[in-house]
């Protein structure tokens, strides 16, 4: 089980990413705009750097919804491989069954 504090930290990061997404995108467009002046682009870089670190999407980590496990995460189910296997064996996931060939 992942610590509750780690789960809370990830939830906080998700909120920050959503809050600053538009602002970040606008600044990145301005930074990559070759028609903008160097001064405007540099100001945009400084503004981007002044945003909270956790508002960057790359700081988020996918975690299992049940256990908080960060590794072996399967996006399709939102669970770790271990919990997917357990649910599969119990028949809780429709259409999913153990492979046999």
From Swiss-Prot:
Assembly notes: Part of the 30S ribosomal subunit. Contacts proteins S3 and S10.
Protein's GO biological process: translation
Swiss-Prot/TrEMBL keywords: Ribonucleoprotein, Ribosomal protein, RNA-binding, rRNA-binding
Entry protein name: Small ribosomal subunit protein uS14
HAMAP family: Ribosomal_uS14_1
A GO molecular-function annotation: rRNA binding
PROSITE patterns (UniProt xref): RIBOSOMAL_S14
Gene3D superfamilies for this protein: 1.10.287.1480
Family: Belongs to the universal ribosomal protein uS14 family.
Gene giving rise to this polypeptide: rpsN
Function in brief: Binds 16S rRNA, required for the assembly of 30S particles and may also be responsible for determining the conformation of the 16S rRNA at the A site.
InterPro entries xref list: Ribosomal_uS14, Ribosomal_uS14_bac/plastid, Ribosomal_uS14_CS
Organism expressing this protein natively: Aliivibrio fischeri (strain ATCC 700601 / ES114)
């Amino acid at each position: 089980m992942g610590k509750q504090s780690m789960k809370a930290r990830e939830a906080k990061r998700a909120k920050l990413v959503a809050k600053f997404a538009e602002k970040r995108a606008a600044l990145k467009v301005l930074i990559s705009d070759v028609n903008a002046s160097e001064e405007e682009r540099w100001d945009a870089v400084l503004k981007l750097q002044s945003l909270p670190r956790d508002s960057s999407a790359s700081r988020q980590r996918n975690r299992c919804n049940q256990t908080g496990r960060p590794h072996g995460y399967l996006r399709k189910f939102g669970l770790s491989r271990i919990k997917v296997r357990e649910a599969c064996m119990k028949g809780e996931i429709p259409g999913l069954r153990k492979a046999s060939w």
